[in-house]
Design a protein with these regions (language model features):
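RNA-interacting cores
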Residues: 1-261
């Protein structure tokens, strides 16, 4: 399984940052109109893929700007749409000129300033990132999940109001496997079936929830999990790049994973 991605960092002055924060929560229709080529999702002609994954998620993630920085991830077909993404950010933030861009490498370090797209973009492999993350979780049985923006997960037709470790882990696996299947190389589906079964062994040992910002719904806070973290930790770690739940492509459901022991 694999998926090509590009990670970008865009510095923002304070007024532009606040406008983008507002746009991500209130102007999603405008963003989808700007990025029509990426938001026009069509079902695959492969009936088995549709049965397993249904409608694909959007192949990009615009993080909520923080501390003067907007992080952006482009996956698969979105990489070729970099000019449209830059134009969208420029327009919604009300910038007079396109912003500076910084491309990131496998370690999250800046390797290229002002990429213009095409062959010069440093394209990363999710499989490569997974390989790099795996040693951090060797013999790991406990990890911490830090929910940084409200997570809105649906289960059995209802929105979860508290953190549930099994649903969280399986949600990350579903999002990861769906994006890989639709926009990359799916690999062996039995791998995700096995991991989903392992996720049933994740249990919550410490919860420190936080209230969602005024006017927003979702789960926030820090949660400590025990279970088969050596097997699931690397994929949860890399899954953090993709966010999770409702509004994931627009900054919601941002999280970080940290091995504890």
């Amino acid at each position: 399984m694999d998926l090509n991605i590009v990670r970008l960092r865009i510095p923002l002055a304070a007024p532009y940052e606040q406008r983008l924060v507002t746009a991500l929560s209130t102007q999603r229709a405008a963003i989808e109109q700007h990025l029509a080529n990426l938001c026009r999702r069509t079902l695959s002609s492969d009936p088995e893929l549709v049965r397993r994954h249904q409608k694909p998620g959007l192949p990009f993630v615009l993080s909520v700007p923080c501390c003067g920085v907007l992080d952006c991830l482009l996956a698969g077909p979105a990489i070729a749409e970099l000019p449209a993404v830059v134009a969208t950010v420029t327009d919604l933030a009300g910038m007079p000129h396109p912003p500076q861009l910084f491309a990131l490498d496998y370690q999250g370090d800046v390797v290229l300033q002002r990429p213009r797209g095409g062959a010069e973009l440093p394209v990363l492999s999710l499989a490569g990132l997974l390989d790099l993350a795996t040693p951090r979780y060797t013999a790991c049985h406990c990890l911490q999940v830090q929910l940084q923006t409200p997570l809105r997960l649906m289960a059995e037709g209802r929105e979860l109001r508290r953190f549930e470790p099994v649903r969280f882990a399986r949600g990350v696996l579903r999002r990861f496997s769906s994006l890989v299947a639709h926009y990359g190389a799916a690999g062996n589906p039995e791998t995700f079936i096995r991991l989903a079964e392992l996720a049933g062994g994740m249990r919550l040992v410490d919860a420190r929830p936080l209230p969602a910002p005024q006017g927003q719904r979702g789960v926030l806070g820090s949660f400590t999990l025990q279970g088969p973290c050596d097997a699931l930790g690397p994929l949860l770690d890399i899954g953090a790049l993709l966010h999770l739940g409702k509004g994931a492509s627009f900054g919601m459901g941002a999280f970080q994973i940290r091995p504890l022991s």
